[in-house]
């Protein structure tokens, strides 16, 4: 019996398997899944749609402030429109790190993310969940994998969706995202204090979910 809300934070770089593991874990536990990366992608999509320069931080912040982003399971809605597929396009992946490193944008979205998580048992994944968004989360995990494996996964994902892309291009894109994510001034990608580190390079999705689930059960004496 869960008497208080449980927060599970899953962080890690691009292609480490965060979203896949978080979705499966949330389903297994019956928790709400919150994809914070999708929220940054939604803002990026709107910025590109409105032909706003990525250097115009003031207008980008205004977009973040005025946009209505809601999540329903794995579906993402921007101002009432389902943009779940559109935000996964390569052009969004290429630009999202530029938008997400703007401090005011992060501040606005962190508030939205905390509000969504209020009063719920949640599994939230992103790049600053255990450090900034939910620093008091009872469970923190940091997933990682080799650069080559992360690029391979993203390449396969795009290929399966019918997107024409070269592996080398995906590899370069992930290198750039790693650099931006780790080097940004606000909420850089770091391993949260007390987080359980899992290298997913040679593990299947199911094996990672099992490790996370067992760690949670062990620390709650099987109550979850």
Curated annotation (Swiss-Prot):
It holds the Pfam family Cytidylate_kin. GO terms for cellular component: cytosol. Its EC number is 2.7.4.25. GO terms for biological process: nucleobase-containing small molecule interconversion; pyrimidine nucleotide metabolic process. It comes from the Bacteria. Keywords: ATP-binding, Cytoplasm, Kinase, Nucleotide-binding, Transferase. It is an enzyme of class 2 (transferase). Its main location: cytoplasm. ATP binds at residues 12-20. CDD domains: CMPK. One of its GO terms (molecular function) is ATP binding. InterPro entries: Cytidylate_kin, Cytidylate_kinase_dom, P-loop_NTPase. It catalyses: CMP + ATP = CDP + ADP; dCMP + ATP = dCDP + ADP. It is found in: Cytoplasm. Belongs to the cytidylate kinase family. Type 1 subfamily. This is Cytidylate kinase. It comes from Caldanaerobacter subterraneus subsp. tengcongensis (strain DSM 15242 / JCM 11007 / NBRC 100824 / MB4) (Thermoanaerobacter tengcongensis).
């Amino acid at each position: 019996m869960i008497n208080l809300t449980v927060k599970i934070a899953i962080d890690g770089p691009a292609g480490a398997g965060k979203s896949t593991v978080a979705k499966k874990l949330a389903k297994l536990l019956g928790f709400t899944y919150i994809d914070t990366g999708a929220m940054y992608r939604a803002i990026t999509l709107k910025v590109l749609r409105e032909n706003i320069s990525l250097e115009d931080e003031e207008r980008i912040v205004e977009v973040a402030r005025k946009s209505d982003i809601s999540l329903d399971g794995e579906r993402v809605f921007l101002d009432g429109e389902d943009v779940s597929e559109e935000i996964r396009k390569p052009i969004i992946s290429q630009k999202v790190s530029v938008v997400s490193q703007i401090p005011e944008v992060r501040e606005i979205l962190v508030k939205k993310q905390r509000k969504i998580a209020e009063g719920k048992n949640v599994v939230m994944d992103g790049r600053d969940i255990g450090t900034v968004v939910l620093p008091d989360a009872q469970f923190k995990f940091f997933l990682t994998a080799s650069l080559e494996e992360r690029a391979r996964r993203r390449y396969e994902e795009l290929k399966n969706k019918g997107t024409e892309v070269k592996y080398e291009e995906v590899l370069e894109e992930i290198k750039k995202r790693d650099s931006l994510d780790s080097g940004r001034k606000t909420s850089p990608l770091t391993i949260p204090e007390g987080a359980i580190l899992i290298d997913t390079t040679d593990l299947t999705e199911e094996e990672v979910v099992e490790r996370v689930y067992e760690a949670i059960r062990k620390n709650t004496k099987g109550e979850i």
